[in-house]
Amino acid sequence: MPAIVLLGAQWGDEGKGKATDLLAERIDYCVRFNGGNNAGHTIVIDGETYAMHLLPSGVLTPGVVPVIGNGVVIDLGVLFDEIDLLTARGIDTSRLVVSANAHVITAYHRVIDKVTERFLGKARIGTTGRGIGPAYADKMSRVGVRVQDLFDEKILRQKIEGALDQKNQLLVKVYNRRAIDPTAVADELLGYADRLRPMVADTAALLNDALDHHKTVLLEAGQGTLLDVDHGTYPFVTSSNATAGGACTGSGIGPTRIDRVIAVAKAYTTRVGSGPFPTELHDGEGEKLRRIGAEFGVTTGRPRRCGWYDAVAVRYAMRINGVTDVVLTKLDVLSHFERIPVCVAYRLPDGRTVEEMPMTQTELHHVEPVYEELPGWQEDLSAARSLEDLPKNAQRYVEFLQELAGVPFSVIGVGPGRDQTIQLKALV
């Protein structure tokens, strides 16, 4: 059986958790391959809401093996808090497998993330302050702490002492903060070792062996394409690859083993943190989208910036990821609008109109959206289970977005519940 990639086509928060849940009964393994607890996903099952940050969505489905891949950076305190919360609600988390090569977020990563963001002032990126960026920076600088290091105390202490030799100089002399005690950091991590050990494995070998035995593996991205460190709106991005290429490097599964790439897109657009957002609404309609769509971050609780659907950005995500199927979510939120503009192009400062993402950051920051306006429907969609059940104007809206994306829409979300979906085509 194949590997399937599921990712976001916008700036994250597209509803990937619900899409994973729809697939869960047809998959055997569910893998997080990037990011850390800066990403959040919410799933509603039988009226129960589950909000998670590190654990793969598949943990909620009996029989599915949830895997945290080597591309993830793990805050072990957050991981075990999530496990304990789910266990208290009757969810079996004993199947969880964690890559020995995943990197670990330490206390000094969190401190550096917060003080750096404050130091930047108005130029700040808008990070969650959870140490994600500094942990990835250490990974690339080859001074990071990996999960496997927790089982070799000597190596762990050497790595932490070496890292803090430099970081404490920065904290004390530049940021006017106190130095961090390497012994305390190491002791904290070693305190997790015994509980963590039974979960740890060579996940690349595990997943490739599963594919060899005709199992289905779902590779689940955190964040979204436009937050990808290489292909997103840099520098206002996350620190990992949230695109299809990241699924390979973050899991150890080769590209020829991937059969489908499913992108999730909201029927409008949201963004958290700083950075360009061409269709952002600064008026009552933006606030209305935020209120009706409950657009507040799962991880931070911050209100999300809201705007109309950006077909230019979504089409870019289709190309970057080689998308085969689209899941459109939150169509029901738009039921409260008489008219619904869709961004079909950008107008550059020099007056040119383009239908592709501008090459430079400067151009993107100064584009104006070119809208085509469609009539709304103002009817409840939550009971719709086929395209024909939708009002004509809602059908027209979906068909227009599909035409602009150039990729078939396989699922349409018409509410937060697992059953509030229209399945146009099987995803697996």
Swiss-Prot record:
Protein's gene: purA
Subcellular location: Cytoplasm
Similarity section: Belongs to the adenylosuccinate synthetase family.
Catalysed conversion reaction: IMP + L-aspartate + GTP = N(6)-(1,2-dicarboxyethyl)-AMP + GDP + phosphate + 2 H(+)
Positions bound to IMP: D13, E14, G15, K16, N38, A39, G40, H41, T128, R142, Q223, T238, R302
Protein name: Adenylosuccinate synthetase
Superkingdom as given in the UniProt entry: Bacteria
Keyword DNA damage found: no
Pathway in which the depicted protein is active: Purine metabolism; AMP biosynthesis via de novo pathway; AMP from IMP: step 1/2
Keywords: Cytoplasm, GTP-binding, Ligase, Magnesium, Metal-binding, Nucleotide-binding, Purine biosynthesis
Main location: cytoplasm
Cofactor-binding details, from the entry: Binds 1 Mg(2+) ion per subunit.
Entry cofactors: Mg(2+)
